[in-house]
Amino acid sequence: MTSIRVAFSRASSAASAVAEIAGQMAGFRPALVLCFAADAQDPAQLAAALRQAFPPPVALAGCTTAGEIGPDGYTNDSVVAIGFAAADFTAATVLIPGLSAFDLADCQRRVEDTLHRSTLQREALGFPNSLAFLLVDGLSLREEPVGRAVQLVLGDIPVVGGSAGDSLHFRQTQVFHDGSAQSDAAVLALISTDLPFRVVKTQHFQRTDERMVVTGARPAERVVTEINGFPAALEYARIVGVPVANLDPMAFAAYPVVVRIGGSEYVRSIQKVNPDHSLSFYCAIDEGIVLSRAQGLDALANLESALARVEEEIG
């Protein structure tokens, strides 16, 4: 029996999707089920159905998405569930609500309590390895402060995760936690295991020498108003060679920008062009940041190379 099982459904109703997922996990006893779902299904109904299909002590976490990875690769309008076998994993989860009025002390208290529960589980079973999985409401604009708060408590425990989406509608993104779906919230799963693992970070982009200095911004809104002293969208369009009218999600994906931090490069994803020719970003941005135009590499080859290195390390 494998330690991790993936289930997939394209059913249009939450009940049918969860029934298919439960069927694909028949005979598999999970400690944790992570669920990623398009907003075609009702999130509240989906979360409730998952709890009915996987009752306690199974831990549940997940979020709505802007696309999923299914058996045939990238897809949309589907539900993906990942089960972690109880024989090899333990999991403790916690909801971090009220992100619009983010309370650092409350967040850290919740994480500390969850870390205590996770430590008791891990020590009882003798599992030596731990990681944290964090999902944040993608419209809350709170990924960075939540991530920092979590990492401060967890110390050397690696934190991975991302933002909830809603098929690029930008109306309501939700996280799942133990049978409920909530906006303005984050969910954290602390996972321990006796299996070896590595955290893998890949991005199929390479920095060029063409730079863009953020000379005007509204950091609280993640909006860049000026690049190199010119209206942001106009200057970005000039540099990448795309008409402003053609700047859409596909163009932003084809012509990404990166920032260099601590010797590593990180993509700063652009969301949209605003009527005043400013640019909205998906992540933290501020005046003075130097962005570089990046060029795309072979995504599949990049991923295969990264996984091959991990296989060499841990077998």
Locate predicted features.
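Small-residue-enriched flexible segments
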Residues: M1-L32, F36-A53, P57-A66, P71-G315
